[in-house]
Regions:
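Catalytic phosphate/metal-binding cores of nucleic-acid and nucleotide-processing enzymes, i.e., regions
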Residues: 1-98
């Protein structure tokens, strides 16, 4: 029997993959405001906000509203709920840097 993947497992994997790729990754938190995405990835002119979820889980309504506001302001916000999702994001970022 395999252990169920948790949000923290996906977050740890994202951190490791970003470090391997040479990206800056930071934990994020709004001051005096809720629903900030979990992580911010910065690399070569690209900035991506990342909301992490356990497999199959979806963002709460307040998070969805905040993501929509951020996207209207021209920000990229990705929601990731799997290790494969992390791999896909890293591959996209590497492709956009070329």
């Amino acid at each position: 029997m395999t252990a169920k993947l948790r949000e923290s497992d996906i977050e740890g994997y994202l951190i490791n993959q970003c470090k391997k790729a040479g990206y800056l990754i930071r934990k994020t938190q709004w001051v005096g405001h809720n629903h900030c995405p979990d992580r911010l990835i910065m690399t070569a002119g690209l900035t991506v906000w990342v909301e992490l979820k356990a497999p199959g889980k979806k963002p709460r309504s307040g998070q969805l509203r905040e993501h929509a506001r951020m996207r209207l302001a021209g920000q990229r916000v990705d929601v990731i709920d799997s290790l494969a999702g992390v791999d896909q994001l890293i591959a996209e970022l590497q492709g956009e840097q070329k």
